[in-house]
């Protein structure tokens, strides 16, 4: 096989779908989905871009140990692996007091432990090739907190720490790790995940009135969100560069300005802005 080999997890929708199709221009892509038989959108988009022959769709549930073990055995046939894009993720929401502990655990199983387990499984095949890359899809939520999204926010903060350590550990092997930190984009993680996994406060909950205001803000923000193709294009750009010089790559409307504000001003200033926007 002449093409380099890339793995993209969570490739049946959102960033993963678009990234898999874009990467197929230059890579042979192993695109994973929990239910490959339902990845019709990926098949159709790949056909539309004439890259169907460069994409292999396979089963992977990043929360299931046996699924990861089976995936690892299958991937060994493609070694060495040149690129791993850890994109699979979901979003649980709600106020901390209202969110069941099981939701926190499930959130971390997908967004943190799933990434760690897949990375550990694939690393032996990545280390065989100097110049390989690992791209972890994080979020602006991995850099700044937001109310009513604590399970998601805390999982992305954990992913940031894992990725930072991973990058340093793999430098001696010529393997570079990067974090992509999108802001608000039109993907199914918000429309599907939060509608299924949001712990909505009861009418008599102390948080009910605040939930309505925050939900209104999130919905308005969603209407102004960006095109997810921007994120897929950034993944492709980093994947095809000779070197990934930085660890973090924030992307999205107003994100860099937000991070600049956070770095220049004290927490109290940021808190005042959030309080005014969300609770006043």
Swiss-Prot record:
Q: Where is the active site?
A: 152
Q: Which UniProt keywords apply?
A: Oxidoreductase
List positions binding NADP(+): 3-29
Pfam families, per database record: adh_short
Q: What is its EC number?
A: 1.-.-.-
GO MF, one annotated term = oxidoreductase activity
Entry-linked InterPro entries: NAD(P)-bd_dom_sf (IPR036291), Sc_DH/Rdtase_CS (IPR020904), SDR_fam (IPR002347), SDR_oxidoreductase (IPR051911)
Q: Which PROSITE patterns match?
A: ADH_SHORT
Annotated positions binding substrate: 139
Q: Which family does it belong to?
A: Belongs to the short-chain dehydrogenases/reductases (SDR) family.
Under the heading NCBIfam families, the entry gives: PRK06914.1
Q: What is this protein called?
A: Uncharacterized oxidoreductase YusZ
Per the record, the gene is yusZ
